[in-house]
């Protein structure tokens, strides 16, 4: 049973299918993740599994967190995530979640932070068209009008303008696991996932599984 797992993006590569077509893939080093807490309806009001991943220095963990992690036999975990489940039967505190809990062909949703690009203008951030480059125009990359004067006399919230681009959490849904390497804790996922190499990823079984219905269909 696959609940979810944390991993690190290694980079992209490609595989070749039976027809000789190149398939872009992402290599993810996932787990092993330690089960740090089990929640149930009696004590917490809901059932969930908390897992930890990645090492950190002892000086960066405060005493409450260290005491919490010590119960699972590991006190230097950097990242913690919780997954809701129907029940925690068959799971034990201090156990491990590995790539072996997934299977080839399974659909997963991968969450992570997108690449941060810093402060960006309208063309890069929103794909706006540029202004004329010749005939005396000085409006090359400027935004143009951002609102009327007297009425409404302000800029409406949500107006697309320059600002910080990227560095936000996003989820890529419905990716297929093509291969699993249990010896090296690797997941080979078809397509791209958020973030740059080394970024933390959250891999969960897909919420929506199956083909999209035809347009106009049910």
From Swiss-Prot:
<protein>
    <recommendedName>
        <fullName>Large ribosomal subunit protein uL3</fullName>
    </recommendedName>
</protein>
<dbReference type="GO" id="GO:0006412">
    <property type="term" value="P:translation"/>
</dbReference>
<dbReference type="InterPro" id="IPR009000">
    <property type="entry name" value="Transl_B-barrel_sf"/>
</dbReference>
<comment type="subunit">
    <text>Part of the 50S ribosomal subunit. Forms a cluster with proteins L14 and L19.</text>
</comment>
<keyword id="KW-0694">RNA-binding</keyword>
<keyword id="KW-0699">rRNA-binding</keyword>
<dbReference type="InterPro" id="IPR019927">
    <property type="entry name" value="Ribosomal_uL3_bac/org-type"/>
</dbReference>
<keyword id="KW-0687">Ribonucleoprotein</keyword>
<comment type="function">
    <text>One of the primary rRNA binding proteins, it binds directly near the 3'-end of the 23S rRNA, where it nucleates assembly of the 50S subunit.</text>
</comment>
<dbReference type="InterPro" id="IPR019926">
    <property type="entry name" value="Ribosomal_uL3_CS"/>
</dbReference>
<comment type="similarity">
    <text>Belongs to the universal ribosomal protein uL3 family.</text>
</comment>
<dbReference type="GO" id="GO:0022625">
    <property type="term" value="C:cytosolic large ribosomal subunit"/>
</dbReference>
<dbReference type="Pfam" id="PF00297">
    <property type="entry name" value="Ribosomal_L3"/>
</dbReference>
<dbReference type="GO" id="GO:0003735">
    <property type="term" value="F:structural constituent of ribosome"/>
</dbReference>
<keyword id="KW-0689">Ribosomal protein</keyword>
<dbReference type="GO" id="GO:0019843">
    <property type="term" value="F:rRNA binding"/>
</dbReference>
<feature type="region of interest" description="Disordered">
    <location>
        <begin position="126"/>
        <end position="169"/>
    </location>
</feature>
<dbReference type="InterPro" id="IPR000597">
    <property type="entry name" value="Ribosomal_uL3"/>
</dbReference>
